Amino acid sequence: MPLFHHTQKIMEKVLSVSLLFVTSFVFSQTQIKFDRFTLDNGLKVILHEDHTTPNVVISVLYHVGSKNEKPERTGFAHFFEHLMFEGSENIARGEYDKYVSRAGGALNAYTSQDRTYYYEFLPSNYLELGLWLESERMKHARVDSKGIETQRAVVKEERKQRMDNQPYGTLMEQVFVRLFNKHPYRWMPIGSMEHLDAASDEDYQQFYKDFYLPDNAVLTIAGDINSNTAKLLVEKYFATIPKSTKTIYRPNIVEESLNGPIRDTVYDRVQLPALIIGHRAPAQGSSDYYAVEMLNTLLSNGNSSRIYRSLVDEKQLAIQAGSFQFPLEDPGLGISFGIANMGVNLLDIEKAILEQIEKVQNELISDLELKKLQNQIENQFVNNLSSVEGIAENLAIYETHFGDASLINTEINRYLAVSKEDIQRVARKYFDEKNRLVLFWLPKAN
């Protein structure tokens, strides 16, 4: 073996071991300690003490997303994300936000296909305020005609601004509806404006009664707290809220094989065409999910990733390119894409993306690439847990979707257990032509 290659091999091994050791050491220092208990009404509570700063996060994750909706009443979960700031029996309309801002805090919420998440970030001496606000939301939120009409207008404007009037704004909507035929993942969380208009006040009130329940929620408190004091306050504000009286609806729908490839075209108000390749993907938490995540990191995490380097830097076919999967509770989907450079044929972008996928299908990645992937994943974990906001959200997600909040400290091991052979296997299984959607996104004629 020539000296250069021999030295290069040694340096690769030293570098990869060093990178893995450094990130493993850092991650080992970020083990999250927490207490967990459940109230008699089924509310799960997680407490994490962190006295680094005098702040606290109070969050509630409701296990309801767009997949819990009826096909003729889509958009309800996201609509309630807005409606739940209208107030309650004890909070005047429009005052919810003001309680938090006057305390020097901030608040926010989001809705996905699988969950709705609310949180307040407050100075720690306002812990009781945050708990009272969230208990009001859970116990007797204001669901009336005036609030419903107000939020209908807000949601319609949101759809216009974020989707209808944005280049490629309906891309996810167009991909999901083609990859799912039966499962409620086929519609996006924002749903149908026609469904929201057609719904009665009673429809909205029933949705609240069906899903905004203590036994359908996880309450997380993270930050500068005393756990014993926090427990007493949780019991004070939440223990008397009634639990559900019937089974909470969870869809149990298995899609048939896609029998692709599916090829289709969308015309949109865009200047540059785009090529989107979609595929069905494994459910979050399954063994294949972690291997597909590693594969997507290989293909598109950063400017040195395979798809970006090939399409953007080397061939200059695209101005942007990448690959990712949606972390969904049921089997979901993943997307690879390229936004074309001026004058580039989308067929050339399709060919270039598939070349990178086929390379993984046919050749094992190198040891150095695997170590680099592990390093990137560990860095992501460290970053996600670098704030009390991230800790609170992740504890709630692990408890809700996995039934085990302690995965906040151990899920990384599932990624590190992925082998080169696993990455090749899932590339062949999920990126197969029969499991593929190819979507041509073209400029609409004036």
Regions found by a protein language model. Give the residues of each.
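Sec-dependent signal peptide recognition
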Residues: E12-L20
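An aromatic/glycine/proline-enriched structural segment found at the starts
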Residues: N181, P189, P214, V218-I276, ...
